[in-house]
Amino acid sequence: MLSSYRHQKKYKKNKAREIGPQLPLWAWKETAFSINQEPYWYSTIRLQGLMWNKRGHKLMFVKENQGYEYWETSGKQWKMEIRRDLDLIAQINFRNAWQYKSQGEWKTIGVWYESPGDYKGKENQFWFHWRIALCSCNKTRWDIREFMIGKHRWDLCKSCIQGEIVKNTNPRSLQRLALLHLAKDHVFQVMPLWRARRVTVQKFPWCRSPMGYTIPWSLQECWEMESIFE
């Protein structure tokens, strides 16, 4: 008996898909008002369709060179470069083996401190960018000038908007502060904390803070954040 299973769908590879019409924020608010919904109605519905565990970007192995394994995230717009020291991985002290590239320099992530102190914000830069790098929001065609006149990117979650602002402006600048205020009331989409920890390689640094995943980053923290991009 022949199997009844057939490949009924032919998937087109490398097909550029535009997600919805590009409309300014006021147009979505008027649409929501006309059907008796909240102003952020469409943003919420659209962003809920981004399944983190299926559509989110992942960490991929690149190469092994001079005692290091090099990895990078699969997203093209927000590509993070990470490496780990194979010599340290083979030892008990594997927690300090991971590094990420920031402004052309390698910084250690996942450090375990043996003496008491205030280490709360030591890893904020990595986890801030890591959350955005994993998110499946399409971060192309970002234009600060259009954003300032009200053409909000409705298909970006609040974390990705904050990330684009940090990437394109200087820390503690008036321009960044103004843009962050514009994005202050944008819809925040929760990303499960396990998503930050789910990678294809063992002994990856453990995310210890819910900031950016279940709790949005504050305006002050984004204003002071250093971008990893040159």
UniProtKB/Swiss-Prot annotation:
State its location(s). Answer: Host cytoplasm; Virion
Q: Name one Pfam family in it.
A: Lenti_VIF_2
Organism of derivation: Maedi visna virus (strain KV1772) (MVV)
The record's similarity note reads:
Belongs to the ovine/caprine lentivirus group Vif protein family.
| The UniProt record lists the keyword Nucleotidyltransferase | no
> Does the UniProt entry include the keyword Acyltransferase?
no
Top-level taxon of origin: Viruses
Major subcellular location class: host cell
Q: What is this protein called?
A: Virion infectivity factor
Q: Name one GO cellular component term.
A: host cell cytoplasm
Its keywords, alphabetically, are:
Host cytoplasm, Virion
InterPro entries in alphabetical order: Lenti_VIF_2 (IPR009979)
